């Protein structure tokens, strides 16, 4: 249950502690972590993602990526047949054969991820030992790591978290005593370039992004590294970096004008940037983004929105939509709510908003139908049934695939929510 308070003020630190959050643990509707390969294989340009799984796994990744297999993308599936699942063949021998063929055919691969799936975990195939064995065979030319993309008790963005966490032990130790900034979480190249220019203009030096575009250019990490999270779904990665001595900067996430400004300010404050310089550098970008957002307020202002738990972006998105576009939050549900990493976001949410962690899909569907919101953010599996009931939807997975961070993308993010409403209005007219 949620404590309802009159007014729309934001939460204080004391109210955050006392705010009740509904927790649910029933049936869920989510994709598995294999989906993360869709954006990770584009980000790390010399890496290959080899899923050890079933034909269903192969169809999921290929369909989600929208890439024809003859285009030779940087992902593939070592398909487990019935004889593998029945234990009639040595799965390790088969895996060694597939990896050898792959690396002979694709000499451009410098980093190979063996990605576990539900089938490989069911038969207890030890991909960590396989990765170690194959690394010894193919090093130093190819680094081979493993992580799980299984959908057993996970949601789809956890695939990136597992991938990056597996890469943290490979990061070189920091030797420079000067402080460095590590931006953690996959960003579109265009967004990464924008942030790099912004940090340079602010005078924040020694900035690196993780994951990098090339696995041969891994950033260093150590006690002088400050972490700035670009995505909210990376708790295991951040924990692994903190174990290496890095320190996380508390900040909202860079969605919208307010979030981007708070995110940049956290870095600027940590690196001693003069407030006047921060204002000088960011003011033109803020003003331009605010003008662009104003075009969508008439369409989105006052509209009621309901979030099903799917991407773990729900809370930063809700903050952006309520505070910058005047949308009304009916319910904001997220698969996992990391109180520490999302503390700055929770402070900015209206204190009366209904927050839910986890999902019991039938109960949540009932609440959604009773509320009849103007738009629902949900996974693909729920979108079509809700549309058939006359409820406008926005696919949450599209918000992960699309560049939405930073000042320049603020209006693009708003348009993603306005577009379904405009489409519905045209269909009804």
Curated annotation (Swiss-Prot):
GO-annotated molecular function: 4 iron, 4 sulfur cluster binding; ATP binding; metal ion binding; oxidoreductase activity, acting on iron-sulfur proteins as donors; oxidoreductase activity, acting on the CH-CH group of donors, iron-sulfur protein as acceptor
Binding site residues for [4Fe-4S] cluster: 32, 57, 118
CDD domains for the chain: Pchlide_reductase_N
Cofactor annotation: [4Fe-4S] cluster
Gene3D superfamilies linked: Nitrogenase molybdenum iron protein domain
Pathway: Porphyrin-containing compound metabolism; bacteriochlorophyll biosynthesis (light-independent)
UniProt xrefs under InterPro entries: LIPOR_BchN/ChlN, Nase/OxRdtase_comp1, Protochl_reductN
Keyword ATP-binding: yes
Reactions it catalyzes: chlorophyllide a + oxidized 2[4Fe-4S]-[ferredoxin] + 2 ADP + 2 phosphate = protochlorophyllide a + reduced 2[4Fe-4S]-[ferredoxin] + 2 ATP + 2 H2O
Top EC category: oxidoreductase
Family matches, as HAMAP family: ChlN_BchN
Purpose: Component of the dark-operative protochlorophyllide reductase (DPOR) that uses Mg-ATP and reduced ferredoxin to reduce ring D of protochlorophyllide (Pchlide) to form chlorophyllide a (Chlide). This reaction is light-independent. The NB-protein (BchN-BchB) is the catalytic component of the complex.
Protein family (similarity comment): Belongs to the BchN/ChlN family.
Matching NCBIfam families: DPOR_bchN (TIGR01279), PRK02842.1 (NF002768)
Subunit structure: Protochlorophyllide reductase is composed of three subunits; BchL, BchN and BchB. Forms a heterotetramer of two BchB and two BchN subunits.
Name assigned to this protein: Light-independent protochlorophyllide reductase subunit N
């Amino acid at each position: 249950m949620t404590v309802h308070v009159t007014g729309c003020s934001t939460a204080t630190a004391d109210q955050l502690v006392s705010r009740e959050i509904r927790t649910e643990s029933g049936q869920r509707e989510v994709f598995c972590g294999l989906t993360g390969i869709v954006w990770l294989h584009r980000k790390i340009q010399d890496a290959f993602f080899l899923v050890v799984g079933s034909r269903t796994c192969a169809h999921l990744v290929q369909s989600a990526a929208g890439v024809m297999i003859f285009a030779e993308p940087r992902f593939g599936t070592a398909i487990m047949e019935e004889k593998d699942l029945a234990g009639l063949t040595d799965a390790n021998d088969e895996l060694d054969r597939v990896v050898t063929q792959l690396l002979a055919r694709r000499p451009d691969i410098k980093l190979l991820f063996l990605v576990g799936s539900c089938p490989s975990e069911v038969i207890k195939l030890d991909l960590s030992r396989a990765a170690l064995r194959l690394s010894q065979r193919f090093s130093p030319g190819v680094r081979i790591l493993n992580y799980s993309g299984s959908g057993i008790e996970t949601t789809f963005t956890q695939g990136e978290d597992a991938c990056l966490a597996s890469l943290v032990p490979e990061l070189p130790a920091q030797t420079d005593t000067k402080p460095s900034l590590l931006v953690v979480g996959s960003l579109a190249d265009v967004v990464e370039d924008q942030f790099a220019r912004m940090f340079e203009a602010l005078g924040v030096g020694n900035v690196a992004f993780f994951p990098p575009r090339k696995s041969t250019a891994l950033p260093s990490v150590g006690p002088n590294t400050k972490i700035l999270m670009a995505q909210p779904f990376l708790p295991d990665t951040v924990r692994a970096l903190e174990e290496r001595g890095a320190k996380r900067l508390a900040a909202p996430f860079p969605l919208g004008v307010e979030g981007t400004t708070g995110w940049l300010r956290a870095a600027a404050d940590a690196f001693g940037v003069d407030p006047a310089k921060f204002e000088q550098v960011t003011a033109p970008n803020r003003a331009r983004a605010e003008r662009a957002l104003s075009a969508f307020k008439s369409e989105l202002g006052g509209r009621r929105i309901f979030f099903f738990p799917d991407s773990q972006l729900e809370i930063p998105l809700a903050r952006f939509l309520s505070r910058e576009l005047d949308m009304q939050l009916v319910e904001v549900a997220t698969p996992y709510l990391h109180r520490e990493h999302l503390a700055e976001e929770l402070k900015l949410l209206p204190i009366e908003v209904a927050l839910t962690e986890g999902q019991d899909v039938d109960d949540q569907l009932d609440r959604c139908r009773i509320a009849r919101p103007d738009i629902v953010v949900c996974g693909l599996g729920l979108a079509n049934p809700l549309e058939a009931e006359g409820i406008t939807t926005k696919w949450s997975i599209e918000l992960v695939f699309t560049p939405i961070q930073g000042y320049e993308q603020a209006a693009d993010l708003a348009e993603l929510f306005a577009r379904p409403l405009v489409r519905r209005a045209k269909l009804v007219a």
